[in-house]
Amino acid sequence: MSFEINWENLTSDSSINESLKEFLDRQFQNISLPSYIANLSVTNFSVGDIPPEITIRHIGDPFDEFYEDENDEGSSGPERVSSNSNMNTKETNYMSSDDEDDDEDNDLSTILSTIAEDSHLNSFSHSSTLYHSHEQSPPPGPAPTPPLLLRSRTSLDPISYIMANTSLNYLHNYNINNIGLGHAPSGTETPTTILNQNALTNAKNSRVISSLQKTTRGENDIQIIAEIEYSGNLHVDLIVNLLVNYPSPNFISLPIKLHITDIVIHSIATIAYLKKAVYFSFLCDINESTPDYFSTSSSSSVSTSTAAPATPTTYNSGGNFVDYIADPNNRERIDIVKKIKIESEIGELENNVLRNVGKVEKFLIEQLRNIIREELAWPSWICIDMSEDEDEEEQTPSPDSRDSNVNSI
């Protein structure tokens, strides 16, 4: 299922570009800068006039974490554009009876349906530290249950269970056959059950969480799992001072204008609408390196990337997914940004200064990738509050009411 976005309505609202610019600028302000640059700031941001191509892969209920985020915000209310990254909550242990589990097992047959297209997906993960309970090699035989990573929010989150007998440093590639327009029991859908081939095995744990999170769900709440392919003209302008620290510190300070363009993204993302707010998060990347990207062949194509170099091992378990033994310290398990271009404006200077410009460009590209991963890759997300405009309209008196107020005076 595909649909068109009225991108013009989105770009016509200058407050969206301004909010995103301020959000990105705050993230850059929190970065520790190297000794050769200073005063980094974002001066302009534009989403551009070319919309992304979006294909719906799944429609269902919003993840419980989005409701949990609303409860955490309390009466203060969300910002226009806010982020939940690196949020910490108190962990609580719960137990469920075997009888309840047995009663709910009958509902698992409807958890997901499949679609015909076959696309290889990279594992989704947050850049926070993984907690390893065991160090062992991948087990032989049938495919093991894909690992569930412990995130910073709470160990009870749907994708944060610690596996008891499997090392957590095995990443998995899934094919898109696991994502369909099927129906799952209300409130049981999680990134794990949607993208995980062994969702039936882990759905019982998800139900425990769902039954414990008593949240008020609106009748209009909806969530879309979509494939997003973007190669538009979004651009970001930055300014930074290039420092020459010889023969003394800050001997020369030269402002440089940097233009970031040509951003390419091809990923699976979740878009949820609930209680007049839109939640957005990337779940995983799509690997386009194989020539039969949209074929329905059952053969598994394996490709490695610089982000997670490893020796792949394929298990025959009725689906195409690959185990990668990755460095646990490697943070680039989801890139989101596949391609990016940066240009700099600088006057004619000595060669040693020009060499530092290349270092600045490389540093900023790496930091921008890190910001996007840490703020937009699950289990982090951004929330866009859509209720502010409605509140302003309610507070603005109508012409008739203003006239009546004047007459009463």
UniProtKB/Swiss-Prot annotation:
Residue span of region Disordered: 64-106, 126-151, 388-409
Record domain SMP-LTD: where: 1-387
Key words of the record: Endoplasmic reticulum, Lipid transport, Lipid-binding, Membrane, Mitochondrion, Mitochondrion outer membrane, Transport
InterPro entries assigned: Mdm12, SMP_LBD
Pro residues bias spans: 137-147
GO biological process: mitochondrial genome maintenance; mitochondrion-endoplasmic reticulum membrane tethering; phospholipid transport; protein insertion into mitochondrial outer membrane
Topological category with respect to the lipid bilayer: Peripheral membrane protein
Feature: compositional bias, Acidic residues: 64-73, 97-106
Localization, UniProt: Mitochondrion outer membrane; Endoplasmic reticulum membrane
Main location per the UniProt record: mitochondrion
One GO CC term on file: endoplasmic reticulum membrane
Highest taxon listed in the record's lineage: Eukaryota
UniProt signal peptide: none
Record-level Gene Ontology MF annotations: lipid binding
Polar residues compositional bias, start-end: 81-96, 396-409
Record's subunit section: Component of the ER-mitochondria encounter structure (ERMES) or MDM complex, composed of MMM1, MDM10, MDM12 and MDM34. A MMM1 homodimer associates with one molecule of MDM12 on each side in a pairwise head-to-tail manner, and the SMP-LTD domains of MMM1 and MDM12 generate a continuous hydrophobic tunnel for phospholipid trafficking.
Record text about domains: The SMP-LTD domain is a barrel-like domain that can bind various types of glycerophospholipids in its interior and mediate their transfer between two adjacent bilayers.
Family membership: Belongs to the MDM12 family.
Role: Component of the ERMES/MDM complex, which serves as a molecular tether to connect the endoplasmic reticulum (ER) and mitochondria. Components of this complex are involved in the control of mitochondrial shape and protein biogenesis, and function in nonvesicular lipid trafficking between the ER and mitochondria. MDM12 is required for the interaction of the ER-resident membrane protein MMM1 and the outer mitochondrial membrane-resident beta-barrel protein MDM10.
Name this protein carries in UniProt: Mitochondrial distribution and morphology protein 12
Organism in which the protein naturally occurs: Scheffersomyces stipitis (strain ATCC 58785 / CBS 6054 / NBRC 10063 / NRRL Y-11545)
Gene: MDM12
